[in-house]
Design a protein with these regions (language model features):
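Active-site gating/metal-coordination segments in enzymes
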Residues: 1-72, 76-85, 122, 136
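Conserved, mostly hydrophobic/aromatic
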Residues: 3, 31, 40, 63, ...
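Structural detector of well-ordered beta-strand residues that form the stable sheet scaffold
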Residues: 11-13, 71, 104, 127-129, ...
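Mid-to-C-terminal alpha-helical segments outside catalytic/metal-binding sites
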Residues: 26-30, 150-155, 163-196
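Glycine-enriched alpha-helix->loop->beta-strand junction motifs that scaffold or abut catalytic
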Residues: 34-39, 62-69, 97-101, 120-127, ...
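Histidine/acidic-residue-rich catalytic or RNA/ligand-binding cores of hydrolases
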Residues: 82-90, 113-122, 138-146, 162-174
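Short acidic/histidine-rich active-site segments
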Residues: 107, 129-131, 145-166
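His/Asp/Glu-enriched short active-site or ligand-binding loop at hydrolase and phosphoryl-transfer sites
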Residues: 126-137
């Protein structure tokens, strides 16, 4: 409803039932083709399965066919459940298996953020978003990556309503990004990856 009413403000990401991957493929295809959704979002810990589980693979292949990214949570979980599903090493496997798949890794990858940065640097199809973290909590290694070789690889995110965009944007000056990097971080990287 929000997407239909405010198409200049909102875009959709599809979700999928991993227990029925082929039904999920059909739903993903429908939402991308009929409703202009821009990607697939899967929170691995909800399913207690890492993204390397075979149930993901039909959906990942369909993302490649539709040329939309998959957005995954990478890092420790907030709820009291295992964080093993969000370890960055799983991203390496799917990046190798699906080199054409755009993979957006949410939540920075903390506490394994340095490993996450290595994979974003290593694979042209792997990206990081900063959702669930305010700028003052970004690890120094991530800020250095944004300012350097990773300026085309990291996207601003908030995980709204957990964090309010305005509150995160107020802290942006802490990062001391130049104008070009700020534009990439806040806008251009997401525009390119999600084809906005």
């Amino acid at each position: 409803d929000c997407i239909d009413r405010y198409p200049d403000l909102f875009v959709g990401l599809a979700s999928a039932d991993l227990s029925k991957p082929m039904e999920g493929v059909r739903e993903l295809r429908k939402y991308v083709k009929e409703h202009d959704f821009k990607g697939l979002r899967i929170v691995q810990w909800l399913w207690d399965k890492p993204c390397t589980d075979p149930l993901y693979y039909p959906l990942l292949a369909e993302c490649v066919e539709l040329d939309v990214p998959v957005c995954l949570q990478v890092g420790i979980t907030g709820p009291l459940c295992t964080s093993r599903t969000g370890q960055p090493s799983h991203i390496e496997r799917i990046a190798l298996d699906f080199p054409e798949l755009k993979i957006v890794c949410g939540h920075i990858g903390a506490p394994w953020h340095e490993e996450m940065i290595v994979y974003a640097r290593k694979f042209p199809n792997v990206y990081i978003d900063t959702s669930a973290y305010v700028p003052k909590r970004y690890p120094k290694a991530l800020v250095d990556f944004i300012k350097g070789s990773g300026k085309h690889k990291v996207m601003f995110g908030t995980n709204f309503p957990m964090l309010m965009p305005a509150d995160c944007l107020k802290q942006l000056d802490i990062l001391e990004l130049d104008e070009e990097t700020t534009q990439l971080f806040l806008h251009d990287n997401a525009k390119r990856v999600f084809k906005l």
